[in-house]
Swiss-Prot record:
Enzyme class (EC, first level): oxidoreductase
Keyword presence, Oxidoreductase: yes
Phosphoprotein among keywords: no
Cofactor: thiamine diphosphate
Organism whose genome encodes this protein: Pseudomonas aeruginosa (strain ATCC 15692 / DSM 22644 / CIP 104116 / JCM 14847 / LMG 12228 / 1C / PRS 101 / PAO1)
Protein name: Pyruvate dehydrogenase E1 component
Alphabetized UniProt keyword annotations: Oxidoreductase, Pyruvate, Thiamine pyrophosphate
EC number: 1.2.4.1
Lineage summary: Bacteria, Pseudomonadati, Pseudomonadota, Gammaproteobacteria, Pseudomonadales
CDD domains assigned to the protein according to its UniProt record, in alphabetical order: TPP_E1_EcPDC_like (cd02017)
Subunit structure: Homodimer. Part of the PDH complex, consisting of multiple copies of pyruvate dehydrogenase (E1), dihydrolipoamide acetyltransferase (E2) and lipoamide dehydrogenase (E3).
Length: 882
């Protein structure tokens, strides 16, 4: 755009500069806003700019001064770099297949060092402690610093990625493997950022509800620019902006590279991210250039240097740091004669030393200082770095991510660059280096962390114990529903409604719903508990005149997450780990369509297990034939199998309200009172039926996974054992009647709330027997239940056959028939669907007769008679294939 009146332009610029000098930024911002409003009202199209020039956000004149000893910190940082490099390389000399990553921490060492020295607050009696999500691939640097601090031994460094024999270090941050060290698993890309957002949000929730003091703690999340392509990385940033989470700080290490090559070779990832975060109402702080550029910026009165910086793309910036100073002079400054003139007095070596912001401790400190003091918005720091910084041959190369070895020449260059006291003769031995106890370095490290409350990272393993009310509190569920038909979903809501009334446990219950509360009949809780809102309720709800109106409250207990399963699961993890992060044990109940649980957020569920989260996941509207009208995408027949892949997830598929009550009470006791590092997955259904009273002595079997529900004591020539769970157990009960009435066959009915728990028990017993030859073999719980029982065993569930197949090896009878709902779901009545998937009462009878015929107890013609009697089509299509 041509400047038609330069004099007038300069007058406007001078006026703005005068306002900035005399009245400050706020006044200037106000005036520019008013001018923008005037221009908009007059119909003038305003310049569109969601990004700022490619330079540091904080001017030199506004930088907070770093108070520490720069030279001592560089010395310590260099030792951390060396030990991180040595640890990875020594591990790979031991076993080349162990792997490891050098370049990520090499690019982010300064980002972490400034945090450790000045900002990461450890938990104390006065401060709850900051929550830090460390970038997974940077773990070697965190270990290396802990080694210098005396927290990790040389033997442990030697055992990096060698954990089986004990005293090793996990590859990445894993609380399950290092429960007193790592707080959060982060190496599955994208899960760290979304969890950090919801941890910060849950921190505000706890503050609003009076569980923790307000305003002290911060959540730091370190991530890579390439990681931002994961939907989970940026998918929830609008929530952080909307909720004004000023306790949240993202530090994005913009080394411009991902594993295979540039993140945005043909564009600028920092500018792209700036626009995205500014649009989501974040405070954006770019740290692009180091202090050695400041004199050049001071010379750039015409703005040509800035113009050149703005036009160069990331692929070129990567190239500059993969080459040398002469290349930078020719290809960056050589674009304009004026720029070459600007650097004519600089040698190629001095040009090469023009540093990037993420490697400059002064610039990083200023950015962090601004971030922790900023109010009303979350902050993102976009720090430009070099991948593989200091590693020589791998620096800024596309191969940098996978570099695990460095040649001797590069090692020597690394040593010299960072002043590591290792002799040439010892270089290939890659010795760890640790200053002596009492040295200046050791004292400085200890002093910096003492000023911040102690060492980091650190994880609390246990918190206060909260008593759980006795089972009798849920007596209404234990006594049955009388003549009234209700679903187990309704029973669940009643159980929660009762538990929240408990003085001790009640306030710690966190109901979480992804915009499905009305589906599950939970809208009554809106008024009772309130929906958490950081601003309360600024409007009058449309249903205010109703009993169950939509009530939002700053102290609300319910987390209503909207149509957002990943966010809801992240909230659940935040609540489920609160015992560790805040010393406040909370008991989250996240209820969702079971099909949109593990299948949708399986990676987060795995992270929950790694995080040692406590709580209940409630798979609502479960069962492939029970949620009958919704069809293929909604009908769940495999969530229990998915849940079974997580070692510390306990899963149950109860049929009756009393089973559900027993399971929830026992799970609460295990997780809240005993603080076992497990979580529960329970499926509940939307089919209404009469809920019977609990049979005497059923509690233990419910928890173990199996108990005798109905025993047929009448005389019969033949007998079978029928197993079932969920709503299909009721079909099994009806099948037992048909077997008796139509064929004179006796049938015992077993409720099996958890085939997964039966498998867990069976595997444990099998392993014990294998390891104790010569001793009396133990029996699995399945063998204890079915041993000595007459006849074949038939199992039927609303899930894939594999669910019940899991216990086959422990079933005493050779004849074990399994029915299940393999195949895609579809819409129809429950009766038709159960016939289609071959799990209804008639198919249970058919399977029982087939098993008896297989053993020779009855003639095959009896099976044929049953097929004819019940109108079963022998030529019907296999539901697995249609």
């Amino acid at each position: 755009m041509q400047d038609l009146d330069p004099v007038e332009t300069q007058e406007w610029l001078d006026a703005l500069e005068s306002v900035l000098d005399r009245e400050g930024e706020d006044r200037a911002h106000y005036l520019m806003t008013r001018m923008g409003e005037l221009a908009s009202r007059s119909g003038t199209q305003l310049p569109y700019a969601i990004t700022t020039p490619y330079r540091n956000t904080i001017p030199v004149t506004h930088e907070a001064r770093m108070p520490g000893d720069l030279f001592m910190e560089r010395r310590i940082r260099s030792l951390v770099r060396w030990n991180a490099l040595a640890m990875v390389m020594r591990a790979n000399k031991h076993d080349p297949d162990l792997g490891g990553h050098i370049s990520t921490f090499a690019s982010s060492a300064t980002l972490y060092d400034i945090g450790f020295n000045y900002f990461f607050q450890a938990p104390t009696d006065e401060h709850g402690g900051d929550l830090v999500f460390f970038q997974g691939h940077a773990s070697p640097g965190v270990y290396a610093r802990a080694f210098l601090e005396g927290r990790i031994s040389e033997e442990q460094l030697e055992n990096f990625r060698q954990e089986v024999d004990g005293n090793g270090l996990s590859s990445y941050p894993h609380p399950w493997l290092m429960p007193d060290f790592w707080q959060f698993p982060t190496v599955s890309m994208g899960l760290g950022p979304i969890q950090a957002i919801y941890q910060a949000r849950f921190m505000k929730y706890l503050e609003s509800r009076g569980f923790i003091p307000a305003g002290k703690q911060k959540v730091w999340c370190f991530m890579g620019d390439g990681e931002c392509d994961e939907p989970e990385s940026l998918g929830a940033i609008s929530l952080a902006g909307r909720e004004k989470l000023d306790n949240l700080i993202f530090v994005i290490n913009c080394n411009l590279q991902r594993l295979d090559g540039p993140v945005r070779g043909n564009a600028k990832i920092i500018q792209e991210l700036e626009g995205v975060f500014r649009g989501a109402e974040w405070n954006v702080n770019k740290v692009i250039w180091g202090r050695f550029w400041d004199p050049l910026f001071a010379k750039d009165t015409a703005g040509l240097l800035q113009q050149r910086m703005d036009e160069v793309i990331d692929g070129e910036y990567q190239n500059y740091k993969a080459k040398d100073g002469a290349y930078v002079r020719e290809h960056f400054f050589g674009a304009r004669p004026e720029l070459l003139e600007m650097v004519k007095d600089l040698s190629d070596e001095e040009i090469w030393k023009l540093n990037r912001g993420g490697h400059d401790p002064y610039k990083v400190y200023a950015a962090y200082h601004q971030a922790v003091n900023h109010k009303g918005q979350p902050t993102v720091i976009l720090a430009k770095t070099i991948k593989g910084y200091g590693t020589g041959s791998g620096e800024a190369k596309n191969i940098a991510h996978n570099v695990k070895k460095v040649d001797v020449d590069s090692l020597r260059a690394f040593r010299d660059k960072f002043d590591i006291p290792v002799k040439d003769a010892d270089l290939e031995k890659l010795p760890f280096y640790k200053p002596e106890e009492g040295s200046a370095e050791a004292k400085y490290l200890a002093e910096r962390r003492a000023a911040l409350g102690g060492f980091m990272p650190v994880r609390r393993q246990k918190s206060m114990s909260v008593p759980v009310p006795p089972l009798e509190t849920l007596k209404a569920m234990l006594d049955g529903s009388g003549d009234r038909e209700i679903s187990t979903t309704m029973a669940f809501v009643r159980i929660i409604s009762q538990l929240v009334k408990d003085k001790e446990l009640g306030p710690r219950i966190v109901p979480i719903v992804p915009d499905e509360a009305r589906t599950f009949g939970m809208e009554g809780m809106f008024r009772q508990l309130g929906i958490y809102s950081s601003v309360g309720q600024l409007y009058e709800p449309v249903d205010k005149d109703q009993v169950m109106f939509y009530r939002e409250d700053k102290k609300g207990q319910i987390l209503e997450e909207g149509i957002n399963e990943a966010g809801a699961m992240s909230s659940w993890i935040a609540a489920g780990t609160s015992y560790s992060t805040h010393n406040q044990p909370m008991l989250p109940f996240y209820i969702f369509y079971s099909m949109f649980g593990f299948q949708r957020i399986g990676d987060l569920a795995w992270a929950a297990g790694d995080s040692r989260a406590h709580g209940f996941l409630i798979g609502g509207t479960a069962g492939r034939t029970t949620l009958n009208g919704e069809g293929l995408q909604h009908e769940d027949g495999h969530s229990h199998l998915l849940a079974s892949t997580i070692p510390n997830c306990r899963t149950y598929d109860p049929t009756y309200a009393y089973e559900l009550a027993v399971i929830i009470r026992e799970g609460s006791r295990q997780m809240i009172e005993e603080q076992q590092d497990i979580f529960y997955y329970i499926t509940v259904m939307n089919e209404n039926y009469v809920q019977p009273a609990m049979p005497k002595g059923a509690e233990e079997g419910i928890i173990k996974g199996m108990y005798l529900l109905e025993e047929d004591k009448k005389e019969a020539a033949h007998h079978v054992q029928l197993l079932g769970s969920g709503t299909i157990l009721r079909e099994v009960e009806e099948a037992a009647k048909l077997l008796r009435n139509d064929f004179g066959i006796g049938a015992d009915v077993w409720s099996v709330p958890s085939f997964n728990e039966l498998r867990r028990d069976g595997l444990a017993v099998e392993r014990w027997n294998r390891l104790h030859p010569g001793q009396k073999p133990k029996q699995s719980y399945v063998e204890e239940c079915l041993g000595g029982r007459r006849g074949p065993v038939i199992a039927s569930t609303d899930y894939m056959k594999l669910y019940a197949e899991q216990i086959r090896q422990w079933v005493p009878s050779k004849e074990y028939k399994v029915l299940g709902t393999d195949g895609f779901g579809r819409s129809d009545s429950r009766k038709k669907l159960r016939n289609f998937f071959e799990v209804d009462r008639h198919w249970v009878v058919l399977a029982a007769l087939e098993a008896l015929a297989d053993r020779g107890d009855i003639e095959p013609k009896v099976v044929a008679e049953a097929i004819a009697k019940y109108g079963i089509d022998p030529e019907k299509r296999n539901p697995l294939d249609c």
